[in-house]
From Swiss-Prot:
It catalyses: di-trans,octa-cis-undecaprenyl diphosphate + H2O = di-trans,octa-cis-undecaprenyl phosphate + phosphate + H(+). Bacitracin is thought to be involved in the inhibition of peptidoglycan synthesis by sequestering undecaprenyl diphosphate, thereby reducing the pool of lipid carrier available. This is Undecaprenyl-diphosphatase. Pfam families: BacA. It is found in: Cell inner membrane. Catalyzes the dephosphorylation of undecaprenyl diphosphate (UPP). Confers resistance to bacitracin. Belongs to the UppP family.
């Protein structure tokens, strides 16, 4: 993988990991357009740039993370259902690794955002700070997050939708989603390395790995800060519309044969 491609994929990862638009869908698009082979080094590269994204969340929210034990307990409770469900259903997920599933979930998630925003129009939110989130609500968010195991759903999208349905205001829903990404992504990455320890031994081209890591970190920091400011003033409808448009783009690419709904998707 060349340095320029590493830079581009790092940007894609940083831009889409925490926006509710499906980072998986964008990585499919990016690797296909760039003509990158999905080999062992690519898998190692993906792990490294995801670590950059995780570090970005810690960097942005470090004050909240060190305010006390309460937030860590809530994140642990939130991760629990995702971890349990993931452990038991992971081996059955290959059946969902299909481009048409991505299409369906992109469009479905977009419609959900639009419907929820219309339903919440002029309504008062019940939860307006992280401190007000109950352990029961944190657990429910974890259940929603587990839906992101379905390709095209978006981890942040699923958990944010869960928060909105539970009465969180937009900013709190997004903040808890971002914070919940820390244990979720760290453990998911560790599990990937445990299953395929050779992935680290394949990471022998340090320059593209470093470029991807730093780029993903910097872009993710900027995106998180921008996103939180954006949703403090606006709603999620633009993201819903974007998801629907992207879903139809994928529909066209798969239907026309430009992309293979099976093999092209298996990242």
């Amino acid at each position: 993988m060349g340095n320029l491609y590493a830079l581009i994929l790092g940007i894609i990862e940083g831009l889409t990991e925490f926006l509710p638009v499906s980072s998986t869908g964008h990585m499919i698009l990016g690797t296909t357009i760039l003509g990158i082979d999905i080999d062992e080094f690519w898998k190692s590269f993906l792990i490294i740039i995801q670590l950059g994204s995780i570090l970005a969340v810690i960097f942005v929210f470090w004050r909240k993370l060190f305010q006390g034990l309460d937030i860590w307990l809530k994140l642990s409770v939130g991760f629990f259902p995702t971890g349990v469900i993931g452990f038991f259903v992971a081996k059955y997920l290959n059946a969902l690794f299909n481009g048409w599933v991505v299409v369906g979930m992109l469009i479905f998630g977009g419609v959900m955002f639009i419907l929820i925003e219309f339903a919440h129009k002029n309504k008062q939110y019940r939860i307006n700070s992280l401190e007000e989130i109950s352990f029961k609500q944190a657990f429910c968010i974890g259940i929603f997050q587990s839906l992101a195991m379905i390709p095209g759903t978006s981890r942040s999208g699923a958990s944010i939708i869960g928060g909105l349905l539970l009465g969180f205001n937009r900013k709190v829903a997004a903040e808890f989603s971002f914070l919940l990404a820390i244990p979720t992504m760290i453990i998911a990455t560790a599990y990937s390395i445990y299953k395929e320890p050779e992935l680290l031994s394949n990471a022998n081209s340090l320059i593209p790995l470093g470029i991807g890591f730093i780029t993903a970190f910097v872009v993710a920091v900027l995106v998180i800060k921008f996103f939180l400011k954006f949703i403090s003033k606006f709603d999620f409808i633009p993201f819903g519309i974007y998801r629907i448009i992207l879903g139809f783009v994928f529909f066209y690419l798969y239907y026309s044969g430009i992309l293979n709904a099976g093999s092209e998707f298996k990242l």
